[in-house]
Amino acid sequence: MNIHEYQAKEILHKFNVPVPKGFVAMSAEEAETKINQLKSDVLVVKAQIHAGGRGKAGGVKLAKSAEEAQQFVKGMLGITLVTHQTGPNGQQVRRVYIEEGSSIKKEYYLSIVIDPKLSRPAFIFSSEGGMDIEEVAKNFPTKIVKLDIDYAADFASFDSRKLSNIFNLSPEQIEKITNVAKNIYDTFIATDANQIEINPLVETNSGDFIALDAKISFDDNALYRHPEIVELRDYDEEVKEEIEASKHGLSYIKMDGNIGCMVNGAGLAMATMDIIKYYGAEPANFLDVGGGASKETVTEAFKIILSDSNVKGILVNIFGGIMRCDIIASGIVEAAKGMSIKVPLVVRLSGTNFEKGKRILEESGLNIIAADELDEAAQKIVKEVE
């Protein structure tokens, strides 16, 4: 689950991470009533969307007066912001964040994530803040350092000496960066986050370190422990199909292709998307129905897939383990009859009761194209949508 920058800063502030003073506004009138709370010669107006690259897209503006800030607010609210992370359709700006400007001496990058190989937190630090960390890794690989955290030693395992040795930072700078990192780590653990990114972490002319921008994402599997975080969810920032899928226990991610996919198991789903691409087409989605899908779940999955107008064909790829292929086949037939599916439908069943499942499909009287192997199924659906 993702949240807005202003929400991330509110959380970080509670854990004593220094952030600029600011407020959120959902209308120009609201901004006008609150603008006098800020006492700074420079104000920063930021569009609040769940995507990076706002600055290059015109979603971050520097104002030299309250009046100019209000003009930026009026011009920003309601526009559709297109960045490298939003996709071509962009995201509508429904709220803006206005904060006091900071005197910037140097920009750094600091984040904490879960290292998937080690299954433990790791800090990423760079002396090149303010730009995508992927670009830094590509163009300045020597300016990034990874600091692993040992759960047994907790934050005491944060090796600040690496920062000193690699980036030639003073003891005072190291102490302040370490303090910020400690508070970020506390936030990370307490909120069950899976990423906190500060980009940039700025050193001001007075020598202080401030989180000028902040991004936090949380582990969906731990949200039941944090109802206060769930309340921060902004459904306007999420894909409607993904919201609907989550209501039915489905894992769905919308993509830009035209072949809908319904698969059980994340690994098999990714393999299915890969083979579709291998044969020259593009998947329209990732959809994992899980190991305990019912007829009702399959029907909902079809509804979600077909709600995407780009879908020109559907590939169902099921391996029956816990989930029986005959149950899935019955669900497919029931859904196809009830929804009058008009796009080509290729189904590949393998595993528990797959022969029963194939008979159910064959005897349904529906125009369902059967396949025994994934390779065969992919070629058939690609041919159908060409």
Swiss-Prot record:
Record text on subunit structure and interactions: Heterotetramer of two alpha and two beta subunits.
EC number: 6.2.1.5
Protein family (similarity comment): Belongs to the succinate/malate CoA ligase beta subunit family.
Residue sites binding ATP per the record: K46, G53, R54, G55, E99, S102, E107
Enzyme class: ligase
PANTHER family found in the cross-reference section: SUCCINATE--COA LIGASE [GDP-FORMING] SUBUNIT BETA, MITOCHONDRIAL, SUCCINYL-COA SYNTHETASE BETA CHAIN
Pfam families found in the cross-reference section: ATP-grasp_2 (PF08442), Ligase_CoA (PF00549)
UniProt function note: Succinyl-CoA synthetase functions in the citric acid cycle (TCA), coupling the hydrolysis of succinyl-CoA to the synthesis of either ATP or GTP and thus represents the only step of substrate-level phosphorylation in the TCA. The beta subunit provides nucleotide specificity of the enzyme and binds the substrate succinate, while the binding sites for coenzyme A and phosphate are found in the alpha subunit.
Matching PROSITE patterns: ATP_GRASP, SUCCINYL_COA_LIG_3
Pathway: Carbohydrate metabolism; tricarboxylic acid cycle; succinate from succinyl-CoA (ligase route): step 1/1
Gene Ontology biological-process entries: succinyl-CoA metabolic process; tricarboxylic acid cycle
Residues the entry annotates as binding Mg(2+): N199, D213
Record's catalysed reaction(s): succinate + ATP + CoA = succinyl-CoA + ADP + phosphate; GTP + succinate + CoA = succinyl-CoA + GDP + phosphate
Gene encoding the protein: sucC
Gene Ontology terms for molecular function: ATP binding; magnesium ion binding; succinate-CoA ligase (ADP-forming) activity; succinate-CoA ligase (GDP-forming) activity
Cofactor note: Binds 1 Mg(2+) ion per subunit.
Residues in ATP-grasp domain copies: 9-244
Keyword Ligase (UniProt): yes
NCBIfam families for the chain: PRK00696.1, sucCoAbeta
Keyword annotations: ATP-binding, Ligase, Magnesium, Metal-binding, Nucleotide-binding, Tricarboxylic acid cycle
Needed co-factor(s): Mg(2+)
Originating organism: Wolbachia sp. subsp. Brugia malayi (strain TRS)
GO CC list: cytosol; succinate-CoA ligase complex
Protein name: Succinate--CoA ligase [ADP-forming] subunit beta
